[in-house]
Amino acid sequence: MPTRHITLLARFGIASLSALLLAAPALAQSPDSAGTQPGDAEAKKTPDALTLDPTLPKWNPTEAKYVEVVSNLDGVPGLFRMWKDEKGVNLKAELPTSIDGQLLFLAYTIASGDPEAGVQFGDLYGSFKRFDRQLAFIQPNMVVRTTGDEESKLGRERVFTDRVQFKTPIEAAGPNGGWIVDLTNLFGRGANQFFGNRVAGADTSLLTIAKAKAFPRNVEVALKMPMRGGSFGSLHYSLSSVPEDNGYKPRLADQRVGYFTTTYRDIGQPSLEDPFVRYINRWRIEKADPNLTLSPAKEPIVFYIEHTTPIRYRRWVRDGILAWNRAFAQVGIDGAIQVYQQDARTGAHMEKDPEDARYNFILWTNSDMGYAIGPSRVHPKTGQILDADVVMDEGFVSSYARVWDLLPEVIGQAYTPETRAWLDSHPQWDPRLRLADPSVRGSLAARLHDELQHSIAAGTVPMGPMAAGVTPAGESATSEDASEAALMGPGAGEGLLGRGTQLNGYCRCGIAKTADLAIARMAAFALFDIEGAQKGDDKDNKDPDPDAPNRPGYIDGLPEEFVGALIKDVIMHEVGHTLGLRHNFKGSNLATLAEFNTAERPLVASTVMDYLPVNVNVGDGPAQGAWGMTDIGPYDLWVIQYGYSMDDDLKPILARVNDPGHAYGTDEDTFGPDPLARRFDMGKDPLDYADSQIRFVSGLRGQIIDRFVKPGDSWSRARRAWETLLSKQVQALNVAADWLGGAHVSRNAKGDPNEIAPVRAVDPVQQRRALQFLIDNALRDDAYGLTPELLSKLSVGRWMDEGGMRDIMAPPAWPVHDRVLAVQSMALTSILNPGTLERIADNEMMTPASQDALTIPETLDTLHAAVWTEVVAPPAGAFSDRSPMISSLRRNLQREWTDRTIELMFPGNFGGASAAAVSTLSRAQLERLLGELDGALASRPQADAYTLAHLSEIRNRVAKSLNPNFLYSR
């Protein structure tokens, strides 16, 4: 420690100096203000003399052979002192006695050894309190407050108490009179308190210190150990001070604009209809000169692009960050966001650590997962954003994604809670399982079941792999007993559920782009009129220098304007999250495909906060439009104006809710009835986009053999191309399925200009179009473009190693019947599920009897005619076993329909208020089919053996099911 600091400590006492440091705000928003923050001067108090607790043994680090951790190159003391032993295993900390009652943040992350390393796992807000020889971390109850009289305050304190999140022994008194605690024991051997089952089986006997850094307002600790299975992983903890009253004024949230919120229940105002108070999460951004129309920011938000970001991407990352300055300029702030490049070659900003809470970083990883996420740290009392980072995984650009594997993420996003519960008890009808690779169906089924159970326990709707929050001990969280202790990252309901303060816990925007990039690599010859820009999965043909383009104007084998634009698109999205913005899945409805596929290349959506597929013009407009979002859109400008305007009167801003481009629908809207509030669609009419995708798929299928696979390539490339294109077909089907029983939902309030009804049934013409789309592109044989020659080419790679093991275990011949039946099953489930049929029934009630409406009987009749075409009107001709009357794909479909309809006929197998109607109508469908089967068998006695056996078997099953003495057993 420098001499001047030793003198200072001897004169004034370490405890008071630590208190001064703890009282300072947590974030420096510009390079010049990293060491001094508003409020630092106010925090200076006359220090007390150094005193040692006589009840504690004294600990001498030198005698114990411990070395102090010194992190700051500028010599500024850290939040508290730390020492590590010579073996790099044990880490001790001296917490100053003044830390008792000081508000702190603790954020914890699986930093390595996990496919999604770096994504924040959880956080806690609270303070340490001493209980004799123990320190307990106590989390205040922030989700229930009172602004009422003294009696209501006393009542709150009696019922809604604070909670202990974890505790640790006080081992001794430190050199400066503070409390010595064992961080290795707390964060390493006690990691299950924070990570639950994710660290079950970790071998803490081989634990080592991976990182220990002490900064003025935060301390960073990472511990490395073998996880379950033996692979090393590291757990990262960040403990930082929290600023208190710094002049920030909270802003109330409004459901018409999409912000993450900080919410509490006010029990002191019983007259309020809604006792919940919601603040938006936002930064404190102010004008340096309030008198200027356009003023520089008083304290701008500063992002540092980490030096690990590849040079070829840096300008696109920078442009994506700075794009948001246009939104702040409209509220009078110039340069609200600044960007600096950290560079190892020049040394620029290399003294800044990405883990230091004083700095906001754009981090770059290479786990090949392809994700991107922009979490932030928010004050749980006010909603003020204190700091934020964006984690970008290079797999977004470089990985050759198995798009088929992403289907379970896409399919069923609109399933209602009733439908999810029904599929849980009827997994044989769940398209998420049917479409999954057979090798992962078991684990996926278990995950989906756990997801549902967590949502039931928490009283929430599942939105991700593990929707419900959990406490640090791994127990299920509820909104009041675990306000801030919610699992983030993979499976957190995107940081929305079980939390008083919401945040962007997980985001699939980057992964969605990964799938489209994989298609672009395979179809580069069609999209960019080039041949062999990249060999795809032939790694030996890639340029050995990752920073070198394959050719001028190209990066990573694709045109720079294409790859760079998508990187900028994703960065704009994630930075939007760090500014407090939630997803807006209605952004894609700004314009028609023809309107944005022009030479002028206008914006393809109203916001960067949507999940947009790559725009490919397939005869939809006169020219190829922008591949993705090239700038922030009208919704982004409007929502920033609401959140960051200097004006107190926000009503004029909200009055523009019905302006073009201001429609808003977020994550919880995706499982509602509105087909426009969906991920992965595009255009004002998503059914036009679905048609376009089918044209895209059909156009490329015929080129798989000749152009997708080059001389010398493995034929496994053909299989991957086929499954990738089939996945695009399934996604188009999924877009159409959401229109059945759909209703447009608006968030406008009564009296808003151009007010529209909050719920309006989708035009029945559009619903019938969607139903016919499902029939034409899933239930008919010609929807798949299969030929004997193509099937003979859909092989797998033959590498007996980790990279090829999955292909080795797959059948060499593509499982055509299993895959096609999975798609057919998906289409049937999209129609015959409780949520869809319930919505169709509700729309009937919402529509006057004199007006047209799609009904359940019409839906079932249309489906019946499509499935049983060969029976309703038997085709003429000579049939044989090699040329059957009913193809094998159609026979499978008809069995599937029969199984489902028999099951739906029996009470108890279908949920919702429409169950009785579905049961009686299903019986009517089977009775009708019985007569049609009799007619077909009588009129075509010389049909092929396959068809006759099939129809006879179906007839017998239907007849038995209609027998009142039939015992149904699933």
What do the predicted segments below correspond to?
Residues 1-8:
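N-terminal secretory signal peptides that target proteins for export/translocation
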